[in-house]
């Protein structure tokens, strides 16, 4: 991976939450967006009012849960990712 995140941005690879073997095929617009993913890259954090950097609480490799409509989808090296602010992450697996 040759992609570096800036500020408090987090790069996430979405994880599918289970495949249905249903014969009914929904269009992409009707499918629920993933809300679980694996952290691929994190930025260094943001600066507070004193000029000190606030470190990130999320680490590469962690599995996280995030808001359904959070972030922006990007494509890098023929793979799709989601870039979001750390504050859009609501939990991580312990």
UniProtKB/Swiss-Prot annotation:
It is found in: Cytoplasm. GO terms for cellular component: cytoplasm. The keyword Cytoplasm applies. Keywords: Chaperone, Cytoplasm. It comes from the Bacteria. GO terms for biological process: chaperone cofactor-dependent protein refolding. InterPro entries: Chaperonin_GroES, Chaperonin_GroES_sf, GroES-like_sf. One of its GO terms (molecular function) is unfolded protein binding. Disulfide bonds: none annotated. The keyword Cytoplasm applies. Belongs to the GroES chaperonin family. HAMAP family: CH10. Heptamer of 7 subunits arranged in a ring. Interacts with the chaperonin GroEL. NCBIfam families: PRK00364.2-4 (NF001533). Together with the chaperonin GroEL, plays an essential role in assisting protein folding. The GroEL-GroES system forms a nano-cage that allows encapsulation of the non-native substrate proteins and provides a physical environment optimized to promote and accelerate protein folding. GroES binds to the apical surface of the GroEL ring, thereby capping the opening of the GroEL channel. This is Co-chaperonin GroES. It comes from Ehrlichia canis (strain Jake). The lineage of its organism: Bacteria, Pseudomonadati, Pseudomonadota, Alphaproteobacteria, Rickettsiales.
């Amino acid at each position: 991976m040759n992609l570096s995140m800036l500020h408090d941005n987090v790069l996430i690879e979405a994880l599918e939450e289970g495949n249905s073997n249903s014969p009914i095929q929904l269009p992409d617009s009707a499918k629920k967006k993933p809300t679980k993913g694996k952290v691929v890259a994190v930025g260094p954090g943001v600066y507070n009012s004193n000029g000190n950097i606030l470190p990130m609480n999320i680490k590469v490799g962690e599995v996280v849960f995030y808001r359904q409509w959070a972030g922006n989808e990007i494509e890098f090296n023929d793979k799709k990712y989601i870039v979001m602010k750390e504050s859009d992450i609501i939990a991580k697996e312990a």
